[in-house]
Structures are given as C-alpha cells and as structure tokens.
C-alpha cells in the first residue's frame, strides 16, 4: 500500500490487527517517507532506522503469537526532550549534543510497553525555550504548510513531522504553549494535560512547575489513543498525581454539546496584535459549536495583562536553577583547554548554550538574586495564584473557556521579532501552565495565505476527556483536521 500514511491511528491499528499489512511494512513506509521528505522539513534530529525495524519485527511476532495490544506495531516519534536509552537525547542543544541516556523516560517506557515503534527523535527549540524551533542547535525546522515559515515551538519538530505525514502521532511537551501553538501553526490537534497527569521522569527540565508532556496528532481521536498510553501516576515523579486515568478513547462521545457552556473572555478577543483572520476563523468555529448545541457566555478574566510578565519571571527563574547542572564537569559539553575551574564553567556554558537559553538564564538568575527575590520571584508567585483563582472563578459559570491558540498564523523563518514581541505571541497559552490547567488546540480553518488557524479550549482540572470529546464531535462535523500540508499532498 502506498498511502498508509493517510490512515488514522485507529485505521493503522485495525489494519495491523487484520493483517492487511505488517508493522515492518508500515514502519519501513514511514522511514522511506522520512528519507525522502525530511531533508526539506528538518523535523527529525535522529532517525532510528535499525531500532525501529527491530521493534516492528518484535511487534509482528507478538501479533502472530496473539499477545498484541491494540496499538502494537503502530509507529510514533518522540520530542528530543524525552530520554531514550541508547539513543541520543539532545534537547536541541549543543550542550547535550553527545548525551546518550542510560535510561528511558517514563513516557518512552509506556510507549514501548504499548508496543509502539519509535521512528526517531524530533527537533525542538533549545531546552524547550522558544516559539519557533529556530533556536535548535541542529537548525530550524520548517512548517510543512509553507517551508519558509516556522512550525511553532518548542515542539516544532513534533508538529512538523505529523503535519508532513512523517509520523502518525508524536509526543510533545508544553511549558507555556509548546504543544498548542505548534499544533495551531501546523493544523494539528494537540493536548496539554493537567499538570501531574503525565510523568515528567526522564523529561529534560525547563521549568519544573510548568512542564507537562502530551500528545500531538491529526485528530482528537488520535490524541486520545496516545493519551491512553502516556497518562498515569508514576512513583518516579514526585509531581505526578495519584488519580484514576480515564479511557480517553471510550469517552470520545461522552460530553454532551447540548447546553455546554463555553466561556468567551472579553479580554482575549481585544488583544493588540490579534490577527483579523485568526479572530474570524475562531469566531466561526465557536458559531459552529453553538449550532451543535453549545451556549456561548461572555466572561471576565481580569488578570490577562499579568500573564506574560508573570510567566517570564517564573519560567526563567526555574530554568536558571534547572540548567545550573550543565557545568562541563559531570556531563554535557565541555570547552577545550580551560585555564582553571572558573574558566571551565564560564566557557562550557557560554559555548554550550545558545543565545535564547542564555537570555532566560540571565533573567532568571537576576529574579532569584538576593536583592530582587522578593520584588520579582515571590511577587510573581503571588500573581500566579491570582491568575489561577481568576480561572477557577470563571469555571463556576462555564464548562470550558475558548480562545485563539496564537494571535497570528505561522510567521516567516528569520522574522525580525524582538524577544518581547516573541514572548507576547504566547499571550493565549501561558496562563494555562501557570494555573496547571488542561487545554487543547483544534484546527479550525486557513487564512488567506493557506496557513492553519487554531482554536484553544481550556478546561477545568482533570477534564482532558471532556476537551477531547468536544473536539472529536466538532471534527465529526467538520473537515479542517483532514486538510493536509502542501508537502504532504505533493508526496502523497
């Protein structure tokens, strides 16, 4: 079959179960596409040809023995922030260019246990710090919809790989929008779960109180299959929550749209910089949900203007602490011929970290310094609590909250944006991480440049099933999630 990459995750799993094709054939099909197309997209940092085929053969043997799970033999790819035993894990940085993890991240372990086949590791902004995937030491990833545009970030490689049909689904991480914004830019469905729902063990840390792993795929149904694999308590992660996990696939039609109250924050649709076409597509999608039975309710989120300054104090502060371990002594990049220990530290970090990572470490170190700790970091944590309370108050009257996922569609690679302009592009996504809430991006149309627009739905704690169900039902009645990027259509 030449069009295996056009099938959904469910169709791939059913095809394997019915012996329409083998996991080896399916895996080889994707590897061939990667070899053919990815030189243009640059979504993969590492392609694991031999290991993938070995995993596929093992999956086929399990099926023949009658011991396979539903997803056994389906391929996926991991963001290069999840540790993979025996495979390079770089976090997109020169600092970890030669790091081979001695263990698997829990997310990778769960994927392996489900019989999923790892195609490789996906490009990302360095240490997940960025919104474009341009800060990667391995070069910028291109948006499959327009190769001169960014795919978003930091999970840009994950989004680009799925959008170009170089993987059926992929893992991502989200610290301030790093699943939802690239999903929006690349026309995908992407879910950021409640903080603590997915294990962070073996996931290289950026900002520990904000980071959360999640799935990226074409549809809510495909995301639900990967969430069933990823979610759950992990004793190795002290922030993982002991709470029963839903069957996200079984619950895809469980949420009634009739009477569902969707909050429309008046502040969100009056943000300076919100593109008129993005606003129009999002409003059209909300009208469609209204036609399907939902009720739109205007709400007030008075803390909106505090999102960006609060996030860009807390996240860099945590990054400053987390990245202090990369000193050129124990592991990571080490400079050549240091004069003394201080020179080793300074040069290893200056040469090993890129400009954006250095910028955030400096901001974070300043915010944590003795004279400014109370004025900046402690105050930001107090405002963070107010942001959380703002959301909880809103959820007393509505079931979910709607917003654009990003104020614009994908911009040009190399666009002359200042760091502040780049940070303001995260206005709609940051608060979800500050509050620890779940949120999902759904593709809802294209702009006049044929670039995807995304709708973000924010849920109350532990409402991942509800979010997936709403988007799934929307996708049963629309075709935006089935539209394919130019490079995927050209190489169908």
Swiss-Prot record:
Domain of life: Bacteria
Annotated keywords: ATP-binding, Ligase, Nucleotide-binding, Protein biosynthesis
GO molecular function: ATP binding; glutaminyl-tRNA synthase (glutamine-hydrolyzing) activity
Active-site residue numbers: 79 (charge relay system), 154 (charge relay system), 178 (acyl-ester intermediate)
Entry's EC annotation: 6.3.5.7
Pfam family name, one: Amidase
GO BP, one annotated term: translation
InterPro entries found in the cross-reference section: Amidase (IPR000120), Amidase_CS (IPR020556), Amidase_dom (IPR023631), AS_sf (IPR036928), GatA (IPR004412)
A cellular-component GO term for this protein: glutamyl-tRNA(Gln) amidotransferase complex
Reactions mediated catalytically: L-glutamyl-tRNA(Gln) + L-glutamine + ATP + H2O = L-glutaminyl-tRNA(Gln) + L-glutamate + ADP + phosphate + H(+)
Homology family: Belongs to the amidase family. GatA subfamily.
Assembly: Heterotrimer of A, B and C subunits.
Database matches in HAMAP family: GatA
Function: Allows the formation of correctly charged Gln-tRNA(Gln) through the transamidation of misacylated Glu-tRNA(Gln) in organisms which lack glutaminyl-tRNA synthetase. The reaction takes place in the presence of glutamine and ATP through an activated gamma-phospho-Glu-tRNA(Gln).
Protein name from the UniProt record: Glutamyl-tRNA(Gln) amidotransferase subunit A
Provenance organism: Acinetobacter baylyi (strain ATCC 33305 / BD413 / ADP1)
GN (gene name): gatA
């Amino acid at each position: 079959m030449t069009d295996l990459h056009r099938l959904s995750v469910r169709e791939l799993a059913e095809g394997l179960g019915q012996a329409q094709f083998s996991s080896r054939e399916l895996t080889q099909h994707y590897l061939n596409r990667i070899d053919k197309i990815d030189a243009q997209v640059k979504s993969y940092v590492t392609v694991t040809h031999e290991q993938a085929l070995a995993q596929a053969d093992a999956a086929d043997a399990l099926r023949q023995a009658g011991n396979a799970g539903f997803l056994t033999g389906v391929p996926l790819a991991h963001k290069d922030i999840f540790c993979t035993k025996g495979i390079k894990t770089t976090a997109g940085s020169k600092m970890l260019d030669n790091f081979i993890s001695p263990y698997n991240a829990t997310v990778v372990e769960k994927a392996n246990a489900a019989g999923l086949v790892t195609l490789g590791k996906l490009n990302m902004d360095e240490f997940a710090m960025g919104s474009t995937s341009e800060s990667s030491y391995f070069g910028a990833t291109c948006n499959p919809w327009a190769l001169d545009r960014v795919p978003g970030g930091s999970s840009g490689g994950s989004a680009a790989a799925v959008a170009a049909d170089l993987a059926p689904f992929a893992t991502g991480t989200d610290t301030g929008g790093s699943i939802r914004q690239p999903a929006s830019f690349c026309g995908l469905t992407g879910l950021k779960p409640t903080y603590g729902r997915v294990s962070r063990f073996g996931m290289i840390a950026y900002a520990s109180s904000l980071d959360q792993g999640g799935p990226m795929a074409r549809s809510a149904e495909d995301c639900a299959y990967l969430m069933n694999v990823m979610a759950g308590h992990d004793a190795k992660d002290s922030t993982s929550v002991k709470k029963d996990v839903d069957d996200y696939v079984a619950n895809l039609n469980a949420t009634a749209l009739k009477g569902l109250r969707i909050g429309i924050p008046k502040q969100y649709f009056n943000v300076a910089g919100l593109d008129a076409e993005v606003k129009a597509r999002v409003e059209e999608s909300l009208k469609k949900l209204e036609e399907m039975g939902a009720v739109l309710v205007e709400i007030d989120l008075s803390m909106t203007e505090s999102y960006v300054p609060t996030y860009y104090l807390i996240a860099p502060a945590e990054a400053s602490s987390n990245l202090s371990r990369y000193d050129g002594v124990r592991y990571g990049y080490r400079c050549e011929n240091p004069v003394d220990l201080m020179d080793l530290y300074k040069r290893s970090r200056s040469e090993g970290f890129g400009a954006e990572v250095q910028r955030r470490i400096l901001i974070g170190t300043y915010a944590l310094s003795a004279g400014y700790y109370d004025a900046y970091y402690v105050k930001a944590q107090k405002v963070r609590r107010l942001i959380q309370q703002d959301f909880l108050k809103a959820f007393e009257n509505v079931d979910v909250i709607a917003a654009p996922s990003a104020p614009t569609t994908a911009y040009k690679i190399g666009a002359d944006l200042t760091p502040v302009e780049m940070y303001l592009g995260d206005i709609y996504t940051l608060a979800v991480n500050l509050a620890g809430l779940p949120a999902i991006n759904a593709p809802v149309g294209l702009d006049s440049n044929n670039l995807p627009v995304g709708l973000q739905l924010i849920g109350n704690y532990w409402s991942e099933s509800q979010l997936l169900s709403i988007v799934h039902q929307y996708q049963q009645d629309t075709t935006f999630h089935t539209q394919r990027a130019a490079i995927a259509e050209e190489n169908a």
